[in-house]
């Protein structure tokens, strides 16, 4: 199976100023493209040659895992945003967040803290288990909650390439601003 670079569901400048056009061009067009290209090269002749991304991320190690993890992570990341979205989740996901975290604001605070305190590069995820129980997962480097049998719902990239062109070392500010472009309909559909 050949893995493809996903198409963005919006124009490259649509998420500005939260995610600048230049950041999207580098992040999607160069970083993600490289992960996809490397993954396709690395899986040739392996047990993963015809596997889907989730399976590869769950079962692989080393370079295959790193490139598959980053491909899966970025596919989820780029498709969860839309210009003019934001707000709070509704429906079952909104209810579960309120129940488990006390309120949406408390959830955001805990999520942002997880993202700002993750040392080095990685991801912070809202994930659910098979019973719908939510958790905030800090994943270093290319990690994804699927490795723990969890379903990733919402992921914020805390690798510096995700924010440095606009925010420099202000990771916390970037995380706070991302909430204004989250498409909760997409995130809810993953729950």
From Swiss-Prot:
The EC number(s) this enzyme carries: 1.15.1.1
Entry note: cofactor: Binds 1 Mn(2+) or Fe(3+) ion per subunit.
Keywords, ordered alphabetically: Iron, Manganese, Metal-binding, Oxidoreductase
Annotated GO MF terms: metal ion binding; superoxide dismutase activity
SUPFAM superfamilies xref list: Fe,Mn superoxide dismutase (SOD), C-terminal domain, Fe,Mn superoxide dismutase (SOD), N-terminal domain
Residues holding Mn(2+): 27, 74, 157, 161
Result of altering residue 155 to T: Converts the metal-specific activity of the enzyme from a cambialistic type (showing the same activity with Fe and Mn) to an Fe-specific type
Swiss-Prot/TrEMBL catalytic activity: 2 superoxide + 2 H(+) = H2O2 + O2
Entry's family note: Belongs to the iron/manganese superoxide dismutase family.
PANTHER family, alphabetized: SUPEROXIDE DISMUTASE, SUPEROXIDE DISMUTASE [FE] 2, CHLOROPLASTIC
Function: Destroys superoxide anion radicals which are normally produced within the cells and which are toxic to biological systems. Catalyzes the dismutation of superoxide anion radicals into O2 and H2O2 by successive reduction and oxidation of the transition metal ion at the active site.
Description of how the protein assembles with itself and partners: Homodimer.
Protein name: Superoxide dismutase [Mn/Fe]
Cofactor dependence: Mn(2+); Fe(3+)
Regulation of its function: Inhibited by hydrogen peroxide.
Binding site for Fe(3+): 27, 74, 157, 161
Top-level taxon in the UniProt lineage: Bacteria
Organism: Porphyromonas gingivalis (strain ATCC BAA-308 / W83)
Keyword field contains Transferase: no
